[in-house]
């Protein structure tokens, strides 16, 4: 299942990159969040952790560091940061700011979408390396 999650996550990331290129920054953020969330859940599942049923799984990554290879521990802070940053923007990237009456398309910039895509891309790269080590060398 973990490998299937990663395949789906990479596909979603491609959609996020396309949305960014089209200037649909809110969509790039939403899709990047979905990609990163699914990637982190794949990483957790790959080491036998049943992930929490929530969007930000950064705490679960932190709580299970000992289950990961040493190299991945050096990059978990960026994974956790991305998970938190994207999760905080998940709702507004979809629905906008209902109190202010602003649609999602008016809330985010190209810098925001670039940051979102970078977080998701980094997570996919980390997961691919981990999976290559775990599943293809066994």
Protein language model annotation of sequence segments:
Residues 1-138:
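Terminal alpha-helical segments
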């Amino acid at each position: 299942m973990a490998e299937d999650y990663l395949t789906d996550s990479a596909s979603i990331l491609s959609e996020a990159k396309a949305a960014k290129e089209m200037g649909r920054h809110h969509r790039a953020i939403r899709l990047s969040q979905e990609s990163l969330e699914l990637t982190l859940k794949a990483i957790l599942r790959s080491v036998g952790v049943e992930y929490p049923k929530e969007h930000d799984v950064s705490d679960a990554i932190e709580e299970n560091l000992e289950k990961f290879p040493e190299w991945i521990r050096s990059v978990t802070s960026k994974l956790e940061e991305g998970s938190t940053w994207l999760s905080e923007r998940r709702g507004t990237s979809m629905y906008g700011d209902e109190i202010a009456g602003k649609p999602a398309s008016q809330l985010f910039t190209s810098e925001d979408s670039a940051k979102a895509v970078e977080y998701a891309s980094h997570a996919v790269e980390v997961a691919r390396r981990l999976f290559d080590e775990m599943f293809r060398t066994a």
